[in-house]
């Protein structure tokens, strides 16, 4: 059984301000050159050719998830007797679903890695962005379904055998949120490679490199 309230038709848009500069992103990448399984002379011979800031859009659905579940767990005593414990569990927590709203396949970014908090209103044209694609209605549906699955997964962790569950989803926010990343291109020998830096915290999100 599912009980839901509708989300407002208008989609809010927000963005995370960039928290690091181009220079900080450059230094983060150069540190990354020295770590992991990479060519031993990468830090010495790599040449950064481009380093630019780009905002990528994510769908984000925040909802209060509620559920009541009944079920049981069983265990066998040393004597061989099978014991059954009956449980009733309640869930009342906030759940967050995110999904990249553009094609970032070559960068390997699929979900938002930042928690809600610190965003500012998005002003179109104020920053360089990748355009959001796809249907907002379909994204909203995927978000609802995903959060219901999260609720049931949490319930299943508490009750070994669920015999009855009812989930309730109360949407709070459905929005597009734009997140800054520094895209750093570099060369090594005749090869061309890319590193993605979190534009808020300065962490490396992913990258390609020549192997040892």
Regions found by a protein language model. Give the residues of each.
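Charged, low-complexity helical/coil segments in non-catalytic cytosolic or luminal regions
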Residues: 2-192, 209-211
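Hydrophobic "anchor" residues
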Residues: 192, 203-204
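Short, acidic, Ser/Thr-enriched surface-loop or helix-capping motifs
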Residues: 198-199
């Amino acid at each position: 059984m599912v009980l839901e309230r509708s989300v407002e038709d208008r989609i809010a848009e927000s963005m995370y301000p960039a928290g690091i500069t181009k220079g900080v992103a450059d230094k983060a990448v150069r540190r990354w050159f020295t770590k992991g399984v990479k060519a031993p002379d990468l830090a010495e011979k790599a040449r950064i050719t481009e380093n630019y800031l780009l905002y990528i859009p994510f769908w984000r659905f925040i909802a209060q998830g509620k559920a009541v579940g009944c079920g049981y767990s069983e265990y066998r005593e040393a004597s061989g007797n099978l014991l059954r414990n009956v449980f009733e569990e309640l869930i009342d927590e906030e759940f967050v679903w995110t999904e990249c709203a553009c094609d970032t396949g070559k960068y390997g970014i699929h979900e938002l890695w930042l928690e809600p908090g610190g965003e500012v209103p998005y002003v179109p044209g104020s920053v360089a962005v990748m355009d959001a694609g796809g249907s907002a209605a379909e994204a909203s549906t995927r978000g609802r379904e995903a959060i219901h699955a999260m609720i049931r997964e949490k319930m299943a962790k508490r009750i070994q055998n669920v015999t009855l569950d009812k989930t309730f989803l109360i949407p709070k926010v459905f929005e597009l949120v734009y997140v800054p990343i520094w895209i750093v291109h570099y060369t090594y020998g005749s090869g061309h490679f890319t590193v993605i830096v979190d534009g808020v915290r300065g962490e490396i999100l992913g990258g390609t490199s020549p192997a040892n």
